[in-house]
């Protein structure tokens, strides 16, 4: 909109609602009452988002590094020296200016500006509850106010919400997901585009069709069967048919291999496909089997020592088959949320390990010197006391090593109590982050389902085919699902004792 003086409409008290006027102390800020600029040499008018405020240059001079403080200096220079003087232009600090009426225009939020006004009046900046942390930060940065100026009553809540917003970064992550989704589904280039697209939908979108849902269920069954089969093969029970278990292992590996190969053949950017974490997990789930076969086939003509080394390698490779459990992350929002939480909370996890390490080192040393004089004591060394301190601080308490003296029992009590306190500090933060990640992923899944339904509706309209999707029902379902998720989110937030989730 053109805000030049000749095109700008005149603002008077009738064109402004009561919420647009500011009633502050006239010695600091003056509110416009009749719509005409006040004839005060120390005041000038700012128009922020359609709301007019009359400010005092004297009050703004206390904040010379802010935008309005600099504007007050420029306005004073213009009044003294005139427009032809070598003074900065007010347009460098505002969006438009009317020197005749001494009014300066800013295309910013008038609601957030009231908090800025309060800061100029009292020197204390409070956080706007209705605005997310990152948007509020953008507003105060525009006005030249540092976020460290936030008052102590709002500072902790603001920085926690800001950290959560930056970590989740909902909009950026959604945009990245959409761009990646579009790049992977460009099947126009390459052979059999229609077949590849349908196959990709079945493999990667379990809710897109009945065939995709059936395929997802079968994939979960194969993962569960392979894990149970691996456990039974290690049990060495007399009634088990090992040959049947080996055949079942071959069948499961064949399924996993075919699933991975089909995904690999469908995508266009195969290098990007191999760098994705779920595909790396799929590859690690099948590679140990083939490496084991290769090692066993090449170990036929080696010595006994070499065969022992090969046997150890084969055992290690077989242990890696437990990674198949991670394949369930493709079908479980909870597992993906757990992975996101561990990735994002590495600082809290490191802090937890640091606290435990310090406590274990201190209490194990004290307990060792308290118990070493007892005959047949189980605290034979400080490393043995490490194990006792670890099980005590984590409240596991195996009981294989226990104190016998009164002093040792007092130390054990202090060790257990400190372990409870130490574990409670970062785990609360990790729990909040997990809840936020889980609800964010659920909202993304709802958005993806809505986008797929709209694409299907658009395609049906373009081809004049039968429309089986109702636009009203699509939006109604998406809104109801988001409301349900937000309700669960608020309930989870109340149960954790905080209100620190902003989306």
Curated annotation (Swiss-Prot):
Residues 171-187 have a biased composition (Basic and acidic residues). It holds the Pfam family BTB_2. Residues 3-213, 263-279, 335-348, 431-503 are cytoplasmic. One of its GO terms (cellular component) is intercellular bridge. SUPFAM superfamilies: POZ domain, Voltage-gated potassium channels. It is found in: Cell membrane. Keywords: Cell membrane, Ion channel, Ion transport, Membrane, Potassium, Potassium channel, Potassium transport, Transmembrane, Transmembrane helix, Transport, Voltage-gated channel. One of its GO terms (biological process) is protein homooligomerization. PANTHER family: POTASSIUM VOLTAGE-GATED CHANNEL SUBFAMILY V MEMBER 1 (PTHR11537:SF38), VOLTAGE-GATED POTASSIUM CHANNEL (PTHR11537). This is Potassium voltage-gated channel subfamily V member 1. The gene is Kcnv1.
């Amino acid at each position: 909109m053109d805000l030049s003086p000749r095109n700008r409409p005149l603002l008077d008290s009738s064109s402004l609602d009561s919420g647009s006027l500011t009633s502050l102390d006239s010695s600091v800020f003056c509110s416009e009452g009749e719509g005409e600029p006040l004839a005060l040499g120390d005041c000038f008018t700012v128009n922020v988002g359609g709301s007019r405020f009359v400010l005092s240059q004297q009050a703004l001079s206390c904040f010379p590094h802010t935008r309005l403080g600099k504007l007050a200096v420029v306005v004073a220079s213009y009044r003294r020296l005139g427009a032809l003087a070598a003074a900065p232009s007010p347009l460098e600090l505002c969006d438009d200016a009317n020197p005749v009426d001494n009014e300066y225009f800013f295309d910013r939020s008038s609601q957030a500006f009231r908090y800025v006004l309060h800061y100029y009046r009292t020197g204390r900046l409070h956080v706007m509850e209705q605005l997310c942390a990152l948007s509020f930060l953008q507003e105060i940065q525009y006005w030249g106010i540092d976020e460290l100026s936030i008052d102590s009553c709002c500072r902790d809540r603001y920085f926690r919400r800001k950290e959560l917003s930056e970590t989740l970064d909902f909009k950026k992550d959604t945009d990245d997901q959409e761009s990646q989704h579009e790049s992977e589904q460009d099947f126009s280039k390459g052979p059999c585009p229609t077949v590849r697209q349908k196959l990709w939908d079945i493999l990667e979108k379990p809710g897109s069709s009945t065939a995709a849902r059936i395929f997802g269920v079968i994939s979960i069954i194969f993962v569960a069967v392979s894990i149970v089969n691996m456990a039974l093969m290690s049990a060495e029970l007399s009634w088990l048919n090992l040959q049947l278990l080996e055949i079942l292992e071959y069948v499961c590996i064949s399924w996993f291999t075919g699933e991975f190969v089909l995904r690999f053949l469908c995508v266009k950017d195969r290098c990007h496909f191999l760098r994705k974490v779920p595909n790396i997990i799929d590859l690690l789930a099948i590679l140990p089997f083939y490496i084991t076969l290769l090692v066993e086939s090449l170990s036929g003509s080696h010595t006994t020592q070499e065969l022992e080394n090969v046997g150890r390698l084969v055992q290690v490779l077989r242990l890696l088959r437990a990674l198949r459990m991670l394949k369930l992350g493709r079908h479980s929002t909870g597992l993906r949320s757990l992975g996101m939480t561990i990735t994002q909370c590495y600082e809290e996890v490191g802090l937890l390990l640091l606290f435990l390490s310090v406590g274990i080192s201190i209490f194990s040393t004290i307990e060792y010197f308290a118990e070493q004089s007892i005959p047949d004591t189980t605290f034979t060394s400080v490393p043995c006391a490490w194990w006792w301190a670890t099980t005590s601080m984590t409240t596991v308490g195996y009981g294989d090593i226990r104190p016998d003296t009164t002093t040792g029992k007092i130390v054990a009590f202090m060790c257990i109590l400190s372990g409870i306190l130490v574990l409670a500090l970062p785990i609360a933060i990790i729990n909040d982050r997990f809840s936020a990640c889980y609800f964010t992923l659920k909202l993304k899944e709802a958005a993806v389902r809505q986008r797929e339904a709209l694409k299907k509706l658009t395609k049906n309209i373009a081809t004049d085919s039968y429309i089986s999707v109702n636009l009203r029902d699509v939006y109604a379902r998406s809104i109801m699902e988001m409301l349900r998720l937000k309700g669960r989110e608020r309930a989870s937030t109340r149960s954790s004792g905080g209100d620190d989730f902003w989306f």
